[in-house]
């Protein structure tokens, strides 16, 4: 069988262009809102009347709507291209595999109706992102649409200035920091969780891609009348035991399984948790299963190679020891912090808060240096594209 085109690293990189697009939208909206919080007067001289006058001007909704509309249009185009590519590469892979198995090619492996349904579902997920997104404020208790976030900042400043607690300048610093820190979020209506907009975009892409790949895999297995699948493998796989017997993905990755019990290979449902949220092809899982034809297919990794897949990864850094999996999690954590600081820098710059912007710049330089040193120590490539905030 030819090599399956959607390896874990390929799957991990696929959503990044669209995730980056939504980070750019977040940056644009932050700039649009925070730039309108500036007043010409010295902060200590600003009165409540000045703030109310500023509030009456509001934010130009046309600019916000234009930014969202442009992002939606670009994302739909890129999403269609991505899905068409996934379909084409799956079709090519399984056509070659069926030829090697000396079987007659089917007219259609996955019908156009099924593909269109998955495409529409994925497009709907992206429309939901722009329809439900908002900025997280009030210490995470409230999520406001972008246009209302501006009024919230001024209302909060009015209350604080009227009480005599702090000046307008200090109130705006707090509001700007909170807007940037929480960032642009999207509500997951099933779980109620509020994801960052780029995380929601990545998940929408991965769900669509996973559904398409699964359809092709299952249809090919049915056509070839095989109950066997080979599971992909990657370095730094989850190796932490959990509630489920399949929680440690490292234990079962890279091997061959059957959909039947008592077969020559272990059961894929019992060992890998296929179909479970925390199992194979579940939430945040980059592993895929590929059709295995006994006597034709060859394993991608030997057992010995799997035993050494994490060699050279992981490290001891600043007094703490990390496994390969823990190192990838720590790297992601630092990336999220860098993105947060970049949002703050953008917001402070837009609001004309020069001192705060410079302070964030210092933090960014230090954290970038730590990120580079940690990635090198852990043997991990730097994922700079994950930290981009577009300008």
Where are these regions (language model features)?
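Acidic, glycine-rich two-metal-ion catalytic cores of nucleic acid-processing enzymes
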Residues: 195-306
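N-terminal leader/targeting and assembly helices and adjacent pre-domain segments
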Residues: 1-175, 304-391
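Contiguous, non-catalytic segments that form substrate-binding/exosite surfaces or channel walls
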Residues: 133, 137-229
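A general structural signal for well-ordered secondary-structure junctions
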Residues: 185, 255, 351-354
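Conserved structured core elements
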Residues: 166-173, 183, 195, 199-211, ...
């Amino acid at each position: 069988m030819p090599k399956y085109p959607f390896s874990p690293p390929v799957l991990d990189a696929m959503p990044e262009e669209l995730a980056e697009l939504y980070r750019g939208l977040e940056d644009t909206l932050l700039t649009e809102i925070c730039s309108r919080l500036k007043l010409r007067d010295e902060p200590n001289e600003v009165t409540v009347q000045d703030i109310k006058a500023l509030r009456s001007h509001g934010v130009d909704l046309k600019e916000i709507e234009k930014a969202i509309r442009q992002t939606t249009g670009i994302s739909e185009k890129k999403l269609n291209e991505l899905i068409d590519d996934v379909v084409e590469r799956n079709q090519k892979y399984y056509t070659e595999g069926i030829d090697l198995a000396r079987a007659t090619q089917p007219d259609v492996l996955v019908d156009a109706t099924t593909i269109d349904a998955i495409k529409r579902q994925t497009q709907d997920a992206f429309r939901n992102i722009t329809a439900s997104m908002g900025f997280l404020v009030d210490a995470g208790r409230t999520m406001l649409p972008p246009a209302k976030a501006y009024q919230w900042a001024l209302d909060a400043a009015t209350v604080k200035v009227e009480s005599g607690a702090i000046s307008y300048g200090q109130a705006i610093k707090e509001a700007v920091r909170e807007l940037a820190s929480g960032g642009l979020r999207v509500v997951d209506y099933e779980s109620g969780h509020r994801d960052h907009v780029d995380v929601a975009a990545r998940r929408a892409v991965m769900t669509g891609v996973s559904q398409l790949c699964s359809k092709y895999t299952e249809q090919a297995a049915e056509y070839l009348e095989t109950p066997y699948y080979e599971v992909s493998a990657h370095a730094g796989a989850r190796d932490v035991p959990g509630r489920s017997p399949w929680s440690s993905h490292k234990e079962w990755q890279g091997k061959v399984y059957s959909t039947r019990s008592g077969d020559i290979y272990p059961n894929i449902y019992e060992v890998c948790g296929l179909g479970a949220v925390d199992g194979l092809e579940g939430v945040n899982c980059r592993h895929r299963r590929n059709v295995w034809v006994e006597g034709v297919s060859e394993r991608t990794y030997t057992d010995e190679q799997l035993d050494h897949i994490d060699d050279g990864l992981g490290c001891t850094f600043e007094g703490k020891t990390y496994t390969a999996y823990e190192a990838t999690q720590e790297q992601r954590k630092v990336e999220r912090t860098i993105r947060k600081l970049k949002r703050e820098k953008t917001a402070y710059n837009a609001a004309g808060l020069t001192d705060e912007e410079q302070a964030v710049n210092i933090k960014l330089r230090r954290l970038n240096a730590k990120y580079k040193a940690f990635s090198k120590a852990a043997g991990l490539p730097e994922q700079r594209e994950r930290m981009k905030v577009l300008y």
